[in-house]
């Protein structure tokens, strides 16, 4: 379809056609807009084994999507609800959009944070509110985030969420233009640090410190306590409902027993 070539296995024809159309009209990438007019090959792997084979087994077992910007290829593990697959597709397309726009690699935390923001993966941020490490004041730096993104599933989930918070902070600093000023400077800047200096007049180290403070203020112990409070409030409401139900049931049983006892007494009197 158009510039998009979709590769799928039997039984996937409908979703392949639908996703090919999504790719062909993909737009709205923060600070970039539409995907550059390059050919794209979308491969939908029907099984984990096939996905691992297509990605040459180089990705972690929790991976369900991969983008190869130099080749213009996106590979998805096409298993599960279509809405979840659509989010994964948007995430991988964001990788293509960013790399094609900048022309080179940028720090991993920015690449993954950008893709998470572009795909509107806000549920990742909700999980941070229950992160006990952040709640008790443990601070990760951006290198820690990069390592987490390459780690096990649990570490990677935290890494994706923290990367998204870093990109969202840069987005807020851009005002109504969002990430556009930074992304306008990135292609010409020699380094990511140079782009930050040109856009926000700060070094990457300065940004890291401000980002750490921002995370602490948003996901510190107060946020954790509030999130846990809602959880326990819900549990408490369920327990209260169960207790009230049991009391009503016991009262009904006692009433029935009392009535039976009264009838027995009447029969005896007769």
Residue ranges, per PLM feature:
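Acidic/His/Gly-enriched intrinsically disordered linker/tail segments
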Residues: 57-88, 96, 100-232
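Juxtacatalytic substrate-recognition/specificity segment
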Residues: 1-107, 159
């Amino acid at each position: 379809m158009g510039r998009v070539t979709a590769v799928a296995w039997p039984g996937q024809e409908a979703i392949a056609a639908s996703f090919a159309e999504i790719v062909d009209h993909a737009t709205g990438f923060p600070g970039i807009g539409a995907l550059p007019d390059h050919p794209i090959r979308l491969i939908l792997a029907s099984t984990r084994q096939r996905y691992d084979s297509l990605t040459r087994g180089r990705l972690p077992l929790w991976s369900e999507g991969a983008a190869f910007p130099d080749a213009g290829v996106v590979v998805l593990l096409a298993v599960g609800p279509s809405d979840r697959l659509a989010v994964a597709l948007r995430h991988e397309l964001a990788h293509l959009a960013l790399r094609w726009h900048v022309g080179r690699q940028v720090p991993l935390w920015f690449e993954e944070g950008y893709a998470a923001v572009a795909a509107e993966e806000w549920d990742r941020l909700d999980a941070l509110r229950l992160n006990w490490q952040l709640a008790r004041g443990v601070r990760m730096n951006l290198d820690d985030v990069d390592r987490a993104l390459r780690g096990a599933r649990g570490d990677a989930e935290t890494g994706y969420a923290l990367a998204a918070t870093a990109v969202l902070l840069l987005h807020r600093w851009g005002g109504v233009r969002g990430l556009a000023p930074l992304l306008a400077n990135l292609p010409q800047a020699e380094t990511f640090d140079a782009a930050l200096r040109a856009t926000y007049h700060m070094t990457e180290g300065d940004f890291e410190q401000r980002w750490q403070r921002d995370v602490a203020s948003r996901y510190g112990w107060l946020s954790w306590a509030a999130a846990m409070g809602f959880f326990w409030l819900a549990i408490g409401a369920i327990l209260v409902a169960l207790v009230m139900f049991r009391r009503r049931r016991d009262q009904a049983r006692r009433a029935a027993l009392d009535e039976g006892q009264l009838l027995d007494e009447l029969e005896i009197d007769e």
